[in-house]
From Swiss-Prot:
Designated name of the protein: Cinnamyl alcohol dehydrogenase 2
Pathway: Aromatic compound metabolism; phenylpropanoid biosynthesis
The protein's required cofactors: Zn(2+)
UniProt-listed Enzyme Commission number(s): 1.1.1.195
Organs and tissues of expression: Expressed in roots behind the root tips in the pericycle region and layer of cortical cells adjacent to the exodermis. Expressed in vascular bundles and lateral veins of leaf sheaths and blades. Expressed in the vicinity of vascular bundles in the first internode below the inflorescence. Highly expressed in the culm.
Residues at which NADP(+) binds: 49, 167, 188-193, 211-216, 251, 275, 298-300
Amino acid sequence: MGSLAAEKTVTGWAARDASGHLTPYNYTLRKTGPEDVVVKVLYCGICHTDIHQAKNHLGASKYPMVPGHEVVGEVVEVGPEVTKYSAGDVVGVGVIVGCCRECHPCKANVEQYCNKRIWSYNDVYTDGRPTQGGFASAMVVDQKFVVKIPAGLAPEQAAPLLCAGLTVYSPLKHFGLMSPGLRGGVLGLGGVGHMGVKVAKSMGHHVTVISSSARKRGEAMDDLGADAYLVSSDAAAMAAAGDSLDYIIDTVPVHHPLEPYLALLKLDGKLILMGVINQPLSFISPMVMLGRKAITGSFIGSMAETEEVLNFCVDKGLTSQIEVVKMDYVNQALERLERNDVRYRFVVDVAGSNIDDADAPPA
């Protein structure tokens, strides 16, 4: 892609305002630093958070914004101090691309909880430039925030694991919920939820999918291998399932009550929140007190856990269920994702979309 010292012009697909509609956008990458890796983007998954950010649902969006944080690409250049990667490596980039490296979370190697973390897009890098994500032809990323995609994992399959797969793996590991025989619940059967079923089943758990309707019963049990299916609006079934689960992975990204799901937990059970919601959630305290239950949360995972989950999926033969689309379909894909019309993750074939040839309107 040229000299390391030179800035590189690339094309991404950017939101220009809170409509969230993406169009081609030309911009320059920062100069490659000593520990930077230049990645030619091959594939990028589409996460529900991309909708939140593109449409300013969280109130902090800055435009133009190139979304995408489930990035798989090929290393094309490396800085002189890069030791982990070389040209030709297939690598992944996830939700964050920077941290302070000095705080307690950073020193404990859980850098995703650093208060000075730098998001892969809709943020400002240390040089003052806006960060832009993986709906683009290339990225420049510090080697600390790059992982190698292991052999045996197709790049388009790897993309959702960098967010959706990692997001369910990390809390199960952290909270000691990896032992065979546990009974887990997965609330919501989208991109994260379907990986929750697959990961938990591969750990030997009895898995119950919890959904608001019976519509996904067949795919949950027949396609994904869930052991049980619970319709949350069925009061009798919910009552019969009370005190039966060791944990629930709550992936729902919209406001919803917590009390019906707290009632499903055993003594010391955990309700693990993963959906990004910008409204307060509520519950009455006896729902947790009278079972020593915990409402907790988890945010993606560390770089070490990212490597772990990729290798875990290779070892267990796990793949994400995806629909691959070209970049010129990305707006339709976002619309379909918003109405839950995907099984279960869109992945954009960036390299196959020839986006550098697109005509970009003025910024």
